[in-house]
Design a protein with these regions (language model features):
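Short, well-ordered alpha-helical microsegments
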Residues: 120-121, 229
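Contiguous alpha-helical scaffold segments within structured protein domains
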Residues: 150-156
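Active-site glycine-rich loop that binds ribose-phosphate moieties when present
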Residues: 116-118, 133-150, 169
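Metallocofactor- and cofactor-centric catalytic cores in central/energy metabolism, strongly enriched
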Residues: 1-115, 126, 131, 156-230, ...
Length: 261
């Protein structure tokens, strides 16, 4: 079975068994994908407030009770094992990347699942729009911008964006399509000159892989949930767990069920 034809449940099974270890862009098409942040209960409200104040990069899909690892948006799933790769931060610095966080998870851990732009890729592909990173077998390009998010408590971060190149006419269509997906970042936040949002070189993404921008194409930028990882690690907490960029949690929610019209 092709990756795009997998059900969300089947993909999670492959991830849990170690058979799938790569980014999830283009996989299980039609299912909503999510960013993950796990942090201590005492900081959960402030982080929730950060997400509420910054809904474009951090749209909330699910917040679990302390110590719970089975999300309501994917009954039977296990957030400790069902992502291809996790990042472990200690005192605000990246310590390691792992494929299982069961030994680090505790009764004090609160998990947040936030919408991901991979979720509207199926609609873009159906409209004949290019998803260059899928075409080239790469992770999506992600960049830290010069735009600040609204802080909350100890949490602050610059806005992170994903970039997908396309022609100007395709960009107009992409705006029309993605505006509907408000819980997975919605419409682009910027189209065109990357320097206007503080990006110096498209060939050097901060996360993910560079992709080819062809003659006649322009970069189109969407808010990205990796913003949440920068925010969660900004106060240098003893332990924070996030997804590894591009290695998302795939829920049982359907893309088309999450649109505003």
């Amino acid at each position: 079975m092709k990756p795009e034809e997998l059900s969300a449940e089947r993909l999670r099974e492959q991830i849990r068994s170690g058979d799938w270890q790569t980014p999830t862009s283009g996989a299980a098409q039609g299912y909503v994908q999510a960013n993950l942040v796990m942090l201590p209960k005492k900081h959960a409200f402030d982080f929730l407030l950060f997400c509420v104040r910054n809904p474009k990069p951090c749209p909330i899909l699910d917040v679990l009770e302390p110590g719970s690892f089975e999300p309501s948006i994917a009954p039977g799933a296990d957030l400790r094992t069902d992502l291809p790769r996790y990042r472990i931060y200690r005192d605000g610095s990246l310590a390691e990347e792992v494929s299982d966080v069961s030994t680090l998870f505790s009764e004090d851990t609160v998990s947040f699942l936030l919408g991901c732009s991979f979720s509207f890729e199926n609609a873009m592909l159906a409209a004949g729009l290019p998803i260059r990173n899928i075409e080239e077998g790469r992770n999506v390009s992600m960049y830290i911008t010069s735009r600040p998010c609204t802080p909350a408590g100890p949490f602050s971060a610059p806005l992170v964006v994903t970039m997908r190149p396309m022609t100007p006419a395709q960009a107009v269509r992409a705006v029309q399509i993605t505006t509907r997906f408000h819980l997975t970042h919605g419409a682009p936040i910027h189209i065109g000159d990357p320097q206007q949002i503080g990006i110096a070189d498209l060939k050097k993404p901060d996360f993910g892989d560079p992709v080819t921008v062809r003659p006649g194409e322009i970069p189109v930028f969407w808010a990205c949930g990796v913003t949440s990882a920068l925010a969660a690690t900004s106060p240098a907490l003893p332990l924070v767990i996030t997804h590894c960029p591009g290695h998302m949690f795939v829920s049982d929610l359907r893309d088309e069920d999450m649109t505003i019209f």
